[in-house]
Design a protein with these regions (language model features):
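Periplasmic alpha-helical coiled-coil/stalk elements that build and connect Gram-negative outer-membrane
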Residues: 3, 138, 154-271, 382, ...
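Short segments within alpha-helical structural elements
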Residues: 192-195, 221-250, 299, 395-453
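Small/polar, glycine/serine/threonine/aspartate-rich low-complexity segments that form flexible
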Residues: 43-45, 49-58, 63, 68, ...
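Amphipathic alpha-helical coiled-coil scaffold segments and their short linker/junction regions
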Residues: 48, 56, 71, 93, ...
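Terminal intrinsically disordered/low-complexity segments used for targeting and assembly
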Residues: 2-72, 146, 230-277, 319, ...
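Surface positions of alpha-helical coiled-coils, especially the charged/polar e/g heptad sites
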Residues: 62, 69, 76, 127, ...
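Sec/SRP-type N-terminal targeting helices
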Residues: 79, 95, 132-160, 210, ...
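Short, acidic/charged, Gly/Pro-enriched secondary-structure junctions
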Residues: 78-96, 105-107
């Protein structure tokens, strides 16, 4: 038997498949952001944040262990990883349509007529319904699935960056609240001592009822703050446990907020803002745009004829025992062409949907770039501002504590009224609390800057 026609048909089909595509070549992107960072945010030497490992950025070993626990056990990150596996499988399924699928077949046919019963046995290997992709429909569907896979992989990377940043922020928040609670409890003890002295003076007639009531006000205010902070501390630990995927050991929890992070230098003047394109969320939006472009190509190809090939080669015989004997070879080749004539507007509607999806993906891509630029610019602007605020707030705390000591001494000497002392105490207590809040804002902004510039993917730089 001459096998040449079938072999030539298969080779030709593989050569022609995927030779053409109707997908748009380029899509103009106009994100509407400056080409460079604002001048006020551009100074000094730049740190390659994306290459800076999170173990290098977060210096505290306890925090490193908590982040490691979160990366191992966080359920949201686990879902993101599984979504990558799912997208990879979907791409492989779609890619398989680009090559012929071979299948072995076996068949027995019995047929009865007036002349008697006949039997026919066949066995062979064949290709069924392989689409000759002359206009790129299958190719574009495969490309769309590939870009979707890349987008999901970028989203998984973004999920890790967010998890690292959120875990570090929750850990530092716990430390700040623990330190605030300690200050509130120490202040409460001091106020309770003052209340006992005020009660003793009042009993001797040395102070008024107003002074006693004002002292009690200080005590109850500090007591309320301490109770609130104890509840807040419990909530902080619950939030950290959710991020870490389980309870965090007590010896890994901070008892104060201290400089725990590597300071990030702002980018130098003239650094182009297109470095944001390396952010995983922007990369995901870009891949979604490319997938939408490929879907347009598939929708356009649906307007053209489709050619499918079916062929087989094997053996056929009326006797099972003679199935593979010489002279029993059989083959078939069945090309089929389908030309869409009337679909009730379905093809045009599918193309309109594909175009709309592309426009949506383009708008989302441009918005992702704009959002990334704003997030980074905001973090850079706050970076310098918060450093100045922390320094100023520390000077305020020092001055308030000095004023409190002097007011106490002058009150004891009878030179100042209790109202002056009361105001000094409140100012000192408030200054300490505000300093902690400012230090926490400084630390969390550094985490934000690390995240928005692409840091947190590598463990070590």
């Amino acid at each position: 038997m001459n096998k040449t026609p079938l072999l030539l048909a298969l080779v030709a089909s593989l050569g022609l498949a995927g030779c053409s595509t109707l997908a748009p070549k380029d899509t103009a992107v106009a994100p509407g952001i400056p080409a460079q960072w604002p001048a006020e945010a551009s100074q000094g030497e730049v740190t390659d944040v994306a290459a800076l490992g999170w173990r290098d950025f977060f210096a505290d070993e306890r925090l490193q262990q908590v982040i490691g626990q979160a990366l191992d056990n966080n359920r949201d990150l686990r879902v993101a990883v599984l979504n990558v596996e799912k997208a990879r499988g979907q791409y492989r399924v779609q890619r398989a349509d680009r090559v012929p699928g071979l299948a072995a077949t076996g068949q027995m046919e019995r047929q009865g007529t007036n002349a008697g019963v006949t039997e026919q046995f066949t066995a062979g290997v064949g290709v069924a319904d392989f689409e000759l992709d002359l206009f790129g429909r299958v190719r574009n569907l495969s490309e769309s699935a590939l870009q979707q896979y890349f987008a999901v992989a970028a989203n998984r990377r973004n999920a890790q960056l967010s998890l690292v940043a959120e875990t570090a922020t929750a850990w530092l928040t716990y430390g700040a609240d623990a330190q605030q609670l300690r200050i509130s409890e120490a202040t409460l003890k001091t106020y309770e001592d003052s209340l006992r002295l005020a009660e003793a003076r009042h009993e001797r007639g040395g102070s008024s009822g107003l002074e006693l009531s004002q002292t009690r006000t200080l005590v109850e205010t500090a007591r309320t703050d301490a109770a609130r902070l104890r509840g807040q501390l419990a909530q902080d630990r619950n939030a950290l446990a959710l991020l870490a995927g389980g309870q965090v050991d007590a010896d890994l929890l901070p008892d104060s907020i201290e400089p725990q992070l590597l300071a990030l230098a702002p980018p130098p003047a003239g650094l182009p803002s297109d470095v944001l394109l390396q952010r995983p969320d922007i990369m995901a939006a870009e891949h979604q745009l490319l997938a939408a472009n490929a879907n347009i190509g598939a929708a356009r190809a649906a307007f053209f004829p489709s050619i499918t090939l079916t062929g087989s080669i094997g053996s056929g015989s009326g006797e099972l025992s003679n199935l593979f004997d010489s002279g029993t070879r059989v083959w078939s080749f069945l090309p089929k062409i389908t030309l869409p004539i009337f679909q009730g507007g379905k093809l045009r509607a599918n193309l309109a949907v594909a175009n709309a999806d592309r426009d949506i993906a383009l708008a989302q891509y441009e918005k992702a770039i704009q959002s990334g630029f704003r997030e980074t610019s905001d973090a850079l602007a706050l970076n310098v501002s918060l450093d100045e605020q922390v320094s100023a707030q520390q000077r305020l705390v020092d001055a308030a504590e000095t004023a409190n000591r002097l007011s106490q001494a002058r009150y004891d000497a009878g030179l100042d009224s209790f109202v002056t002392l009361l105001d000094a105490r409140r100012t000192a207590y408030s200054a300490q609390q505000t300093r902690l809040q400012t230090e926490l804002a400084q630390q969390t902004n550094r985490i934000t800057l690390y995240k928005v510039m692409g840091g947190g993917w590598h463990e070590r730089g």
